[in-house]
């Protein structure tokens, strides 16, 4: 219940940002810039079965997003992303390059799917939409709030009691860095790498102890993460708000 309340408050805050942008855009003579886009890349799980980023754990993911510029530097963004999750204890390597004892002992693997709805703010270092400027690219940073639904299954070759399939609905804090390039007045390319800090340890259903066992088979104090890296294409819309002519007529009278 608390997670749901936090999620609603978070999205309410993001929604207020979009509302403020709409109000500001009504200033006569102001130019509103917005984008819609699609992206594709890889989704990576990080948790008990993959304690660090592993390139081989990348699984297909797609995203659709909407951006609205609040200023030349600040952009509000909402996005929907879906992808697959995979991990295997046998792919983990320790400092000596060998399979860590815990991973070998547990011998588990995970698979599943994840759907995320997010909103947040991008900070652009350059105004790459300004066609009068020679700079048509910008690096940016992003931070926001996300709600996600994950349906995953974990199986262990050593502990049948670990086998579990289930779903999780929770919150995450997405942070990312990226790069945008304006191909033309309307078309843009993007590259982004980001991480999502979740508030659950249930993506892999391993909470620190095996079911029916007293052995430690995970870290009960380490919550799960997931990461996204990908490319995107977006289309920019421009709108210039002209002064209301009715106001001028009223003044002449």
Where are these regions (language model features)?
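Predominantly the C-terminal beta-signal and adjacent terminal strand-loop region
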Residues: 184-253
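Extracellular/periplasm-exposed beta-strand and loop segments of Gram-negative cell-envelope proteins
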Residues: 48-55, 85-116, 150-170, 202-209, ...
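Short loop/turn motifs that connect adjacent beta-strands in outer-membrane beta-barrel proteins
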Residues: 25-33, 72-73, 127-137, 185-186, ...
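Short glycine/proline- and aromatic-enriched beta-strand/turn motifs that initiate or cap beta-hairpins
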Residues: 24-68, 152, 228-241, 253
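Residues on the lipid-exposed face of transmembrane beta-strands in outer-membrane beta-barrel proteins
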Residues: 38-40, 64-68, 119-123, 143-147, ...
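Bacterial Sec-dependent N-terminal signal peptides
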Residues: 1-31
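Gram-negative (and chloroplast) outer-membrane scaffold detector with strong preference
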Residues: 72-155, 237
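Transmembrane beta-barrel architecture of outer-membrane proteins
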Residues: 57-61, 114-118, 138-140, 170-174, ...
